[in-house]
UniProtKB/Swiss-Prot annotation:
Protein's membrane topology: Multi-pass membrane protein
CDD domains on file: QFR_TypeD_subunitC
This protein's name: Fumarate reductase subunit C
Taxonomic source organism: Photorhabdus laumondii subsp. laumondii (strain DSM 15139 / CIP 105565 / TT01) (Photorhabdus luminescens subsp. laumondii)
Keyword set, alphabetical order: Cell inner membrane, Cell membrane, Membrane, Transmembrane, Transmembrane helix
Similarity remark: Belongs to the FrdC family.
InterPro entries reported for this sequence: Fumarate_red_C (IPR003510), SQR/QFR_C/D (IPR034804)
Annotated GO CC locations: fumarate reductase complex; plasma membrane
GO molecular function: succinate dehydrogenase activity
Subcellular location: Cell inner membrane
Length: 130
């Protein structure tokens, strides 16, 4: 026997995520995908400009000097740093590191990840500026 009764569906306001700080931070963290997309498009544009020759590269550099583009790139950098920070905080939770029968805390792992990131960044910048 079937019933024609409608199931209860709880209504949800469009601003449900604004009520708790956890949800707001989650939306902010997930929105870093937009800045990552911007950087990817910018990088592809730069590669095509590099391939296009001196004039094309000069136009790309001029494009990057636009104040609006500089502001968007600063926001992109902040988004990348936020995304990196949250992933580094997640890494110790995903890996159980046991040393001498004791589980290692998250602090040393996070510090190591940041140290490696800074060292690799400095090496890449050093090579690029030579």
């Amino acid at each position: 026997m079937t019933t024609k009764r409608k199931p209860y569906i709880r209504s949800m306001a469009p601003n449900w995520w604004q009520k708790l700080g956890f949800y707001r931070f989650y939306i902010l963290r997930e929105s870093t995908a937009v800045t990552t997309m911007w950087f990817s498009i910018l990088l592809i544009y730069g590669l095509f400009a590099l391939k296009g020759g001196t004039q094309s590269w000069h136009e790309f550099v001029t494009f990057l000097q636009n104040p609006v583009i500089l502001l968007v790139n600063i926001i992109t950098l902040l988004g990348a740093l936020l995304h990196t920070k949250t992933w580094f905080e997640l890494a110790p939770k995903a890996a159980n590191i046991v040393i001498k029968g004791e589980k290692m805390g998250s602090g040393p792992v996070i510090k190591l990840l940041w140290a490696v990131t800074i060292i690799v960044t400095m090496i890449i910048l050093g090579i690029a500026l030579l």
